[in-house]
Every structure is written in C-alpha cells, then in structure tokens.
C-alpha cells in the first residue's frame, strides 16, 4: 500500500462475497452508476451494504464519488437517472460522465482495456478524463 498512490479493485456489479471483501480492505469506493432504470434500485442496496460494512468491518470506508456510466444523451432515461441521483444522493459526483460507446462494449471481448483497444475512442478519452479527475481529487 505504501508503494502505490492508488490501488484499484474492479468488482463485479453483484454484491457478492468478493465485493464485500474488497470493501473491507478498501479506503474508499468509486460507485459507477449505469444510466438505466434498475441501476437506481441497485444503488440503494449498495449504499445499505456500504453502511453495514462501515458499521461492522471497515469504519474508515468512504464513498470517494459517484460516476455515471453508459450515459446516452439521446434518451430521457439517462437524463432522469442523473437528475434523480444528483437530487437524492448526498455524495461527490464526478463531472466526467462515461457515455455508452460501442468500442467500450467491444474491448472486453478482445481481452483488452479500452485504452489499448481504441485509445482515441470517446470511451477511452472519457475514462482518461475520469482518471485525471480522481487523481486531482486525491491531491486535494
């Protein structure tokens, strides 16, 4: 831990034992929220789980921020999800929004991260902006 500025543990979207273990060892969490209807239901369950982990296993755990993913500006649903979360969640919300992007969807099937699969894609550029935002926040 002393040798790195950041250690990222990318967990599956399900609240599994792996996710609980990651929360137990982490200092903070970045919560990705898909701009989809069911993501809002999952968010309340995730917040509840984080609170339980804070109470029982890791009192220092904090939510670093929330990032919107799979955002599609052409849909009212994406706009509504963003508005709903901003109105109801008292957390840091990153300015960077990760758009729905075909290259992002393709990259895992080629076993590559987006910054190697298509570094000039909108998705790759968005994740680079998010990384810069996270790093900058960590320096504050």
Predicted regions and their residues:
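Hydrophobic "lid"/C-terminal helical patch
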Residues: 130-134
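Generic C-terminal helix-cap and adjacent flexible tail
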Residues: 135-140
């Amino acid at each position: 831990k002393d040798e790195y500025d950041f250690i990222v543990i990318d967990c599956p979207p399900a609240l599994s034992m792996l996710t609980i273990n990651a929360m137990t060892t982490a200092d903070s969490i970045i919560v990705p929220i898909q701009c989809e209807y069911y993501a809002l239901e999952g968010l309340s369950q995730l917040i509840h789980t984080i609170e339980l982990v804070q109470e029982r296993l890791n009192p220092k755990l904090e939510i670093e921020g929330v990032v919107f993913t799979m955002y599609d500006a052409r849909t009212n649903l994406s706009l509504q999800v963003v508005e709903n979360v901003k109105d109801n969640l008292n957390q840091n919300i990153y300015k960077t929004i990760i758009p729905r992007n075909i290259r992002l969807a393709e990259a895992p099937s080629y076993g590559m991260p987006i910054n190697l699969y298509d570094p000039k894609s909108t998705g790759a550029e968005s994740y680079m902006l998010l990384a810069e935002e996270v790093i900058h926040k960590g320096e504050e």
